[in-house]
Regions:
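Glycine-rich phosphate- or other oxyanion-binding loops that anchor nucleotides, phosphorylated ligands
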Residues: 20-214
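Short, conserved "active-site rim" segments that organize catalytic pockets and cofactor/ligand binding
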Residues: 1-12
Length: 214
């Protein structure tokens, strides 16, 4: 979303904006590194489109996915940042067709996709789906079955695109709301400012993850 990208855009220099497939793309430098920010929009299809634009049009050799997300257990805290080690799409289900676990893509043998990690932050498992809700059924699926720590609406789709393209993908999520602590919608809006302050503070470290040379 635009508001999630704003702290990043404020830190960029030599900015030049264009559009691909209706998505805002801002190229420039960030802490001395050439970067491009693709503002995807909400949801898995938007996220996949944005990742493919970065890879095909911008020739990205690495993807950094940044954003706020919901926490699912006591192992995460509001306003804190976490790195994603594995991501699954919890609303993708071929169980009835082939007996695979929920979230297992047709081209994969397991449901969680591994991501590239820098090890600068605590590692967590992410569940992605096109829903923002307080559904008890979703919560049971995410925690009891998938054992996820964090939920969002984009990360798993970006991981899938990067897997097929062979492009390393780092994902960093800042917790805006916690399941079981009242309305996640109210928490989300109340805690956005705190999340953006965390992003500003940690942005240089995050960008450094994508500039480490082998």
């Amino acid at each position: 979303m635009d508001k999630e990208a704003e702290p990043i855009l404020q830190a960029m220099a030599k900015k030049k904006e264009t559009k691909y497939c209706g998505k805002r793309v801002i190229c420039g430098t960030l802490f001395g590194e050439k970067v491009a920010v693709v503002i995807c929009g909400v949801g898995k299809v938007n996220a996949a489109c944005g990742a493919q634009i970065a890879i095909d049009k911008l020739k990205a050799t690495l993807i950094l996915n940044l954003g706020v997300a919901g926490g699912l257990n006591a192992g995460v805290k509001v306003g804190e940042i976490y790195e994603i080690s594995h991501a699954v799409q919890y609303d993708f289900d071929l169980t009835q067709l082939n007996g695979t676990e929920i979230g297992t893509l047709d081209e994969c043998k397991t449901n969680y996709l591994p991501l590239t990690v820098c090890g600068k932050y605590p590692l967590k498992k992410l569940a992605t789906g096109d829903r923002f809700n307080d559904s008890p059924a979703d919560y049971a699926l995410l925690t009891n079955i998938l054992k996820a720590d964090i939920r969002d609406m984009e990360g798993g789709a970006i991981a899938q695109v990067c897997m097929h393209a062979g492009v390393p993908c780092f994902e960093f999520k800042i917790i805006s709301d916690l399941a079981g602590s009242g309305s996640t919608t109210e928490q989300y809006f109340s805690n956005l400012g705190l999340c953006f302050e965390t992003l500003k503070r940690e942005l240089k470290t995050i960008v450094a993850a994508g500039t480490v040379k082998d």
